From Swiss-Prot:
The protein's name: Probable protein phosphatase 2C 7
Annotated catalysed reactions: O-phospho-L-seryl-[protein] + H2O = L-seryl-[protein] + phosphate; O-phospho-L-threonyl-[protein] + H2O = L-threonyl-[protein] + phosphate
Binding positions for Mn(2+) 2 per the UniProt entry: 151, 313, 352
Cofactor note: Binds 2 magnesium or manganese ions per subunit.
All copies of domain PPM-type phosphatase, residue ranges: 115-361
Binding residues annotated for Mn(2+) 1, in chain numbering: 151-152
MF terms (GO), sorted A to Z: metal ion binding; protein serine/threonine phosphatase activity
UniProt keyword Transport present: no
InterPro entries associated with the record: PP2C, PP2C_BS, PPM-type-like_dom_sf, PPM-type_phosphatase-like_dom
Organism of provenance: Oryza sativa subsp. japonica (Rice)
Biased segments, Low complexity type: 21-39, 80-89
Superkingdom of source: Eukaryota
EC number: 3.1.3.16
Amino acid sequence: MAAHGGGGVEEDQAGSSSLCPPAAEAEAAAAAAAIARAARPPRPGRDKRLGVRHPLKHRRFRAGGKAAVAAGAREVGEATTVAEATATGPPKGSDEDDEARYICGGWTSDDGRMSCGYSSFRGRRANMEDFYDIKSSKVDDNQINLFGIFDGHGGSHAAEHLKKHLFENLLKHPSFITDTKSAISETYRKTDSDFLDAETNINREDGSTASTAIFVGNHIYVANVGDSRTVMSKAGKAIALSSDHKPNRKDERKRIENAGGVVTWSGTWRVGGVLAMSRAFGNRFLKRFVVAEPEVQEQEIDDDLEFLILASDGLWDVVSNEHAVAFVKAEEGPEAAARKLAEIAFARGSTDNITCIVVKFLHAKMAVDAASSSERS
């Protein structure tokens, strides 16, 4: 990916070209078949972000209902409150293969204003280090819906910590409703600090991205650290709501070098010759340079806003923003769309874990709610 400066977002960070969804049907069919053939024994892999080989670990991902990939969605279908669901298996309404390499499902918000689909696939990697979280709650009578993708590297500890604690911490922040942007930034930093303090093995270098979409009333707050990404479809156009944190981004490189760090080329641009992203949770020995300070974008929900896509780089490395939006539009609903995105990414040769959330806005329900509110007033 080419370097880009500033803190703004790009319309298509993975490149773009026109793609008619019907022309992709053959690719989609091949993708589904490829997913079905993916149940082969795991093998050691390379963590491309750390640039090192690591042994086969976390065999619990082969243990059916106790798989950590399933843990990423326990709230969905089981509980839509801040409280953690007690179920140890996949969520109700989800599908999981016999070795927990692929899980998908759907969810509709309590207020009926949005629905989502999610898909998480270990893919060609030996280990599953992607986690995700979907929560719904009320704070001071405000309906809150939260969606997050956490893509781990060097191990799954950091991503799992975020899945368990990031939204929990945010919902407890005293300024969450009155100053949401500041609350998000402070919560990201606190959760990073808590993880580093809680990790007893100081030699571990686990890290994780975070791409989150937080819905408060009629506003969306998208925050990101790392190279997971959130893209919206607005009036038919793909628009990125986050900007990947890469070491060769002009502003990021300057920040790292001002802090005494270096950015070097080793297969790709890396911080200290090691990490292929410039911001992350964890990464203790690079913490001075690799910060967990999020960039936060605010977006008002209007009738032109059709859906959001949140995904790990297992999708974005091989599917452009525009193509992802086109694939989602071609599907009947968000659950089928999330599944299709994972299938397409795998068929196109993605070598990473692939996790996607598609959030669709149900504007008819929103209009009814607005009319009812107007009549009461």
